[in-house]
Amino acid sequence: MATTLEVQKRETTQHSEVTRLRSEGKVPGIIYGYKSENVPVSVDSLELIKAVRDNGRNAVFSVTVDGKKLNVLLHEYQVDPLKDVLVHVDLLAVDMNEEVETDVRVVLVGDAPGVKAGGVLQQIIHDVKVSATPEKLPETIELDISSLEIGDVLTTNDLPENKDYVVQAEEEETVVTVSAPRAEEEPTTTEAPEPEAVHGNDEEPVE
């Protein structure tokens, strides 16, 4: 069952109104998608953060706008990099019976023997596109790296299959690898030339 999220419809999108909302701890946003035109809304910042923390980034939330109930996903959000606060959210209205596509984080699990042997673990892909009905969207996809030795690679083909969703990614794209450690360069030393021998005067002294 979708978690309820309280939103308020915004009557204006003027900059002064947006500034006022943010000063009150609210985040301006927009709802669009299934059976919904672009509707400007606002949501309490702390309530939204708590809802996502408790239910997950890809959870379905139930909202009511103009007396109409909608199921929405947190599709996109913007964060002020200096203040580290939410400044805008996009809520995607969805049909619970229709597939949607969204980003899902790839989480590495296990300990790679190659790392213990001195190799360097490099995760190239951190998120992949996944399609599923809203209630089947995974929060993360786990990729087991416990078999990786130095020089080994895991690709998108190695991501675990699941009947509830489909990973939309190019085949054989590198997700993670364990590379050999860089060899330390030996310091270059230059031998100093040996000093030339100093010869004395071979002439006999004059008496």
Swiss-Prot record:
This protein's assembly is summarised as: Part of the 50S ribosomal subunit; part of the 5S rRNA/L5/L18/L25 subcomplex. Contacts the 5S rRNA. Binds to the 5S rRNA independently of L5 and L18.
Gene Ontology molecular functions: 5S rRNA binding; structural constituent of ribosome
Please, which domain of life does this record's source organism belong to?
A: Bacteria
Answer yes or no on keyword Membrane. Answer: no
Output the GO biological process annotations, alphabetical, semicolon-separated.
Answer: translation
Q: What Gene Ontology terms describe where this protein resides (cellular component)? A: cytosolic large ribosomal subunit
The role this protein plays is:
This is one of the proteins that binds to the 5S RNA in the ribosome where it forms part of the central protuberance.
Give the NCBIfam families listed for this entry. bL25_bact_ctc, PRK05618.2-4
Q: Where is this region: Disordered?
A: 171-207
Stretches of Basic and acidic residues bias are at 196-207
Please give the family membership noted in the entry: Belongs to the bacterial ribosomal protein bL25 family. CTC subfamily.
Q: Does the keyword Glycoprotein apply?
A: no
InterPro entries named in the record: Rbsml_bL25/Gln-tRNA_synth_N, Ribosomal_bL25/Gln-tRNA_synth, Ribosomal_bL25_b-dom, Ribosomal_bL25_C, Ribosomal_bL25_long, Ribosomal_L25_dom, Ribosomal_uL5_bac-type
TM helices/strands, residue ranges: none
Taxonomy-wise, where does this protein's organism fall, top ranks first?
Bacteria, Bacillati, Bacillota, Bacilli, Bacillales
Q: Which Pfam families match?
A: Ribosomal_L25p, Ribosomal_TL5_C
Q: Which UniProt keywords apply?
A: Ribonucleoprotein, Ribosomal protein, RNA-binding, rRNA-binding
**What name does UniProt use for this protein?**
Large ribosomal subunit protein bL25
Q: Which gene encodes it?
A: rplY
Q: Which PANTHER family match?
A: RIBOSOMAL PROTEIN L25/GLN-TRNA SYNTHETASE, ANTI-CODON-BINDING DOMAIN-CONTAINING PROTEIN (PTHR33284), RIBOSOMAL PROTEIN L25_GLN-TRNA SYNTHETASE, ANTI-CODON-BINDING DOMAIN-CONTAINING PROTEIN (PTHR33284:SF1)
